[in-house]
From Swiss-Prot:
Protein name per the record: Death-associated protein-like 1
UniProt KW keywords: Apoptosis, Differentiation
Keyword Ion transport: no
Annotated region described as Disordered, given as residue ranges: 1-26
Organism: Bos taurus (Bovine)
Gene field: DAPL1
InterPro entries tied to this protein: DAP1/DAPL1 (IPR024130)
PANTHER family in alphabetical order: DEATH-ASSOCIATED PROTEIN 1, DEATH-ASSOCIATED PROTEIN-LIKE 1
Highest taxon of source: Eukaryota
């Protein structure tokens, strides 16, 4: 009995699942635990995210209202905010020279 060695077969080898051979190549297995965790639903998180979304929508509505009021008071500011800034000096690009390099044909 002293000579018997107990070998435990664990699904993890070296801290990760063993590779599977498919088509002559070794492919690492995906962990099934991660898949199960993704499919489980937590009802508590859904409720908090729904209330957070409602709060975000309300704040965005409040901001839109204030921006509308300001745009009526200052229409030029709202108009300029949507335009691209124009440079004071136009940049003149020099014409590019076309360099033709004569090369022998490939046979």
């Amino acid at each position: 009995m002293a000579n018997e060695v107990q070998v435990q077969l664990s699904p993890l080898k070296g801290g990760h699942p063993p590779a599977v051979k498919a088509g002559g190549k070794r492919i690492s297995k995906k962990q099934e635990i991660g898949i199960l965790e993704r499919h489980t639903k937590k009802t508590g998180l859904e409720k908090t995210s729904a209330t957070a979304n409602v709060a975000k929508i309300q704040t965005m509505d409040a901001l839109n209202d204030t921006l509308e009021k300001l745009s009526h008071k200052f229409p030029a500011v709202a108009h300029m905010a949507h335009q691209k800034p124009r440079p004071a000096l136009e940049k003149v690009t020099p014409l590019k020279r076309i360099y033709i390099i004569q090369q022998p044909r490939k046979c």
